[in-house]
């Protein structure tokens, strides 16, 4: 936000005629996270993204008569670990149900899910909300339930040949559905929740969270109402494909509903699609007629039992929640607290580092190697220089080819005053484009050494004084800021290589009234 979120959250276009009365927006999220598993939820077929069409399909996935589901133990473990990390109550017994509906890419005619008794309930997420230009604050959203379910296949529509094709590679992929209470109010809060969830799931290694591959899908339920009134009619927005789009889609939909009310219209209960190209929501289908999914118990799967006893161990046929809780790593908020308490970072810096795991890795690696280098100097360089450089290239930090050892060498050279900040920034660009090069070689090759020689500094200052006569006069009349113009002239004359600390010190001595 980068903060990696700050970079990615872009406010959606504002609409006209928004009512001026006090209205509140209410947002609830449903998140489908694909479990990181080598095989599907109820079959042994593979889960690789991008596999040839219909190449990862078991008989069960294609609904061949006589085939039965076999529950994937790894998926249950991942579901339990995720539930614990999100503060849920894991249920000792959960059950599977059939949810009936007809799609061409759902060969069974039903989806196996957990409607009546989910794997876990009653969790919550507390997360930092980062809004450009505003102070960071924390928000809490309740997690109503986390359930296991299978994904459907994928329909491919060929308009030219007027036909539809079905790819069943996705059919049966393992999903965790996380249903959050409508505790959010803005698009920024929703995007921040999803960003935090991504950080948690990646720490747990229970989901890749690659939204571009469909590994994490977000639906938003949005409504508006006047303060003190019951909740309004909600709309559901689907097809939100990125963290940035979550903020944009929800912000747009809130404004659309406000404008509709201002113009005397009525909000209808409908499903809308997010059109990322035109940055607007588009009506898909009504939800006014409640669809009957005819939920019924899944007869081919027994109730799922887990062991809730403290200190218990998992066995071949019974998973221990206590044992799985021992496998949960440090979570993002714990890392933020550690950075604040042990490394004396401020809260906002800690949030930025945790939001960008590669920056956090670089920071911890550098602090271990360069204990005498102030943490503030390291953070400033990583955030203000490396991150800014990546943002300008529209590049994720993890895709930047600069290694942690190279960053250490740059910071060591900077701290030793061998180079200045301008040269350090130049080295970032050079190393990204030449990842095999060494910092010392690049400094020599491009003559990036800082000018620290007293004689050279003296000559440069004298030239700058001669070139900036007006600024010199202003400075000697008491306008202290005029010194910046003279120092800037030195930087220009030295091709940004002069040690500016020494330059300022020398200029102050040269321009004292007694030195006229």
Swiss-Prot record:
Assembly description: Subunit of the heterotrimeric GatCAB amidotransferase (AdT) complex, composed of A, B and C subunits.
Catalytic activity: L-glutamyl-tRNA(Gln) + L-glutamine + ATP + H2O = L-glutaminyl-tRNA(Gln) + L-glutamate + ADP + phosphate + H(+)
Location(s) in or outside the cell: Mitochondrion
The encoding gene: GatB
EC number: 6.3.5.-
InterPro entries per UniProt: Asn/Gln-tRNA_amidoTrfase_suB/E, Asn/Gln-tRNA_Trfase_suB/E_cat, Asn/Gln_amidotransferase, Asn/Gln_tRNA_amidoTrase-B-like, GatB, GatB_Yqey_C_2, Gln_synth/guanido_kin_cat_dom
Coiled coil (residue ranges): none
Family indicated by similarity: Belongs to the GatB/GatE family. GatB subfamily.
Protein biosynthesis is among the record's keywords: yes
GO cellular component, one term: glutamyl-tRNA(Gln) amidotransferase complex
Superkingdom: Eukaryota
Primary location recorded for the protein, binned into one broad class: mitochondrion
The keyword ATP-binding belongs to this UniProt entry's keyword annotation: yes
Annotated protein name in UniProt: Glutamyl-tRNA(Gln) amidotransferase subunit B, mitochondrial
Known role: Allows the formation of correctly charged Gln-tRNA(Gln) through the transamidation of misacylated Glu-tRNA(Gln) in the mitochondria. The reaction takes place in the presence of glutamine and ATP through an activated gamma-phospho-Glu-tRNA(Gln).
Keyword terms: ATP-binding, Ligase, Mitochondrion, Nucleotide-binding, Protein biosynthesis
Gene Ontology molecular function terms on file: ATP binding; glutaminyl-tRNA synthase (glutamine-hydrolyzing) activity
Lineage: Eukaryota, Metazoa, Ecdysozoa, Arthropoda, Hexapoda
One GO BP annotation of this record: glutaminyl-tRNAGln biosynthesis via transamidation
Extra facts: This protein may be expected to contain an N-terminal transit peptide but none has been predicted.
